[in-house]
């Protein structure tokens, strides 16, 4: 029975659609916006000191919504200073979406963009082959370390690219989130794939400690409304199930006992809160800021 369950990553279109539903039904981007508004200005306060150009490296920049927020904060901190913003993103579709708003945003005259259609490991290999380790003032990795095979090596490499006063920002799900409980209890019962691994801020901070890197970690509460998951035949619910379990067509292919057990657990307090008739999954995010 389990063999009929396929990884969501085996169907790119389905993955993109379920991810969109997740964004529409969660406070993920609002949570990130809050961090950018309240915390980021202090974090980037010195990254451009005495520099004629600020170099920013976005790893897994996606469609650029959060990248543009980051750029606006850097511009506000360093008005008129040239910014070199390079983006490493493996999806051509996401790069195309990123370029659209950039072309329409009027205040980006001092920002130079470059996009590289590659994974972080492909970028790492290319840079190491060139033997030109360019230093960066700000590197950010937003919700992408799940897709990296060797996370400690990736952290070590990109940390080595930080220049004077530079910072690296990583955003991942928190160890206090429902994701942590979900993956620990059910991860082995979901389809296995080599494209994604279960990692939370607890895992990352342990890796950073092992590497001897200096960092600060901030948690911000976020939720995902999964109420539709409990309505039979609801398309939104089906796609949110797929996203939660990283399974293609979970509702149609999962064994009944797994569906029943998971459906019950997801309504328990350690996974979700119930508010005004809604079931709100704990999507708390961690923002980890690493020093050069």
Curated annotation (Swiss-Prot):
<keyword id="KW-0808">Transferase</keyword>
<comment type="function">
    <text>Inactivates histamine by N-methylation. Plays an important role in degrading histamine and in regulating the airway response to histamine.</text>
</comment>
<comment type="subunit">
    <text>Monomer.</text>
</comment>
<feature type="binding site">
    <location>
        <position position="142"/>
    </location>
    <ligand>
        <name>S-adenosyl-L-methionine</name>
    </ligand>
</feature>
<feature type="binding site">
    <location>
        <position position="283"/>
    </location>
    <ligand>
        <name>substrate</name>
    </ligand>
</feature>
<dbReference type="Pfam" id="PF13489">
    <property type="entry name" value="Methyltransf_23"/>
</dbReference>
<dbReference type="GO" id="GO:0005737">
    <property type="term" value="C:cytoplasm"/>
</dbReference>
<feature type="binding site">
    <location>
        <position position="94"/>
    </location>
    <ligand>
        <name>S-adenosyl-L-methionine</name>
    </ligand>
</feature>
<dbReference type="InterPro" id="IPR016673">
    <property type="entry name" value="HHMT-like"/>
</dbReference>
<keyword id="KW-0489">Methyltransferase</keyword>
<feature type="binding site">
    <location>
        <position position="120"/>
    </location>
    <ligand>
        <name>S-adenosyl-L-methionine</name>
    </ligand>
</feature>
<dbReference type="GO" id="GO:0032259">
    <property type="term" value="P:methylation"/>
</dbReference>
<keyword id="KW-0949">S-adenosyl-L-methionine</keyword>
<feature type="binding site">
    <location>
        <position position="89"/>
    </location>
    <ligand>
        <name>S-adenosyl-L-methionine</name>
    </ligand>
</feature>
<comment type="similarity">
    <text>Belongs to the class I-like SAM-binding methyltransferase superfamily. HNMT family.</text>
</comment>
<keyword id="KW-0963">Cytoplasm</keyword>
<dbReference type="GO" id="GO:0046539">
    <property type="term" value="F:histamine N-methyltransferase activity"/>
</dbReference>
<protein>
    <recommendedName>
        <fullName>Histamine N-methyltransferase</fullName>
        <ecNumber>2.1.1.8</ecNumber>
    </recommendedName>
</protein>
<dbReference type="GO" id="GO:0001695">
    <property type="term" value="P:histamine catabolic process"/>
</dbReference>
<dbReference type="InterPro" id="IPR029063">
    <property type="entry name" value="SAM-dependent_MTases_sf"/>
</dbReference>
<feature type="binding site">
    <location>
        <position position="28"/>
    </location>
    <ligand>
        <name>substrate</name>
    </ligand>
</feature>
<feature type="binding site">
    <location>
        <position position="60"/>
    </location>
    <ligand>
        <name>S-adenosyl-L-methionine</name>
    </ligand>
</feature>
